[in-house]
Amino acid sequence: MKRVSKRVASLLLAGSLALLSASCSKDNTSSANSTNEYGHINLSALRTQVNSLPNEPLSPAETNGLLLMREEEKLARDVYTTLYQKWGSQVFSNIAGSEQTHTDAVLMLLTKYNIADPVADNPVGVFSNPVLQNLYHQLVAEGNISVLHAYKVGATIEDLDIFDLANAMTVADNQDIDLVYSMLSKGSRNHLSSFYRNILNAGGSYTPQYLTQAEFDAIINSPMETGF
C-alpha cells in the first residue's frame, strides 16, 4: 500500500498543485476556540472570521489547491463513513463527523471566491477527481481486510492530508485560505494521533509514509490541539 499511495500522492500534487514555489512566511490569524479534540470546526465562528478577511486575487495554484482539498477532505469523510459501517469502531464515526466540517470549511472558500464546487451533490464514494476516485476504492479495499488495517488506512489518510496541506500552504498567501488550512491541519494532527492510539491498542504499528519520522513523532507526542 505504501508504494501505491506514494505514487497517488505524487499524481495529486503534480496534477493539482503547482508546489514548486518557495515557502512563504505567514501571519497566523488568532481566533476563538474553534476546534475540539476530534477537530470538529465551529463553522459559524469560522465563517465570521473568513468573511472579515479581504477577497484577494487567487493564483492558479491556490485555486487548484482549494479544489483538491475540498475533495480530499470528502475522501477522508467517505472512507471513514464506509469503514465505520464495516467495523463499527466509534473513532471512524467521530472523525467522519469532523471531516464533514473540514470539507464544509473549504466549500466556504469556494463560495466566497465563486469557484464551482467539484463535490456538488456527489454521494459517498463518488469524486470528480479520478485520482481520488481510484484512491477511495483502494483505501476501502485495504480497510476492509481487518480493523487494524482500517486504523492504518485512517493514519495514512491523515498523514497524506497533513502533508498536502503543508504543501498547499507554501503557495497560498491569501489570509482566509491560510486560516482555513491552519484549522484543517490542526484537526488532521488530532486525527492522526487518534488513529495511532487505536493502532497501538490493536497490537499494530505505523510508519509515516509522507511526513518525516520527526514530524510524525512530534504530532503523536503532543497534547491534543483544542483551539488557537
Label every model-predicted segment.
Residues 3-52:
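Bacterial Sec-dependent N-terminal signal peptides
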Residues 32-228:
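All-alpha RGS (Regulator of G-protein Signaling) helical domain and cognate RGS-like helical scaffolds
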